[in-house]
Amino acid sequence: MNDLLMTENPSRLRVTLPRLAALIVGLALVLFPFGWLGEIWRPFGQIVDDLFSTVWAHAIGHTSLFCLLGLLALAMFPVLRRHPWRYLGLLLLAGIGQEAFQLLYKGRLLLFDDMRDLVTDLFGLLLAFATVWGWGWLWRRDR
């Protein structure tokens, strides 16, 4: 990143910074402890409890959130499409960060549920990658 900031080509920097900002906003939404907010602000907590009342609803929520984050990352940084392991590694760190924040505000140790959440996060990331790959394959085939 430092090399990019020191480059003689400012147009490259103008392209990269908005993309990076979009990804940072996406990461902030993923990392934000909505469960904590639900405890502090009870009307919001009631909505969260209603939306994610079952284990399946919770899993679908995690999968959807990380699928959207993956789609955003792949759209903003297309080079990640050629490096699936980097893509998965970097964005799985967001899942680990999310679980770490949840453990901090809940004040407890790691449980089975937290590992299950990471698996659903990984599934969402893989779904995003497969969607982008499939879309690209269809687009190239039709040309």
Listing of model-derived features with the role each one plays in the protein:
Residues 2-116, 122-143:
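Bulky hydrophobic segments
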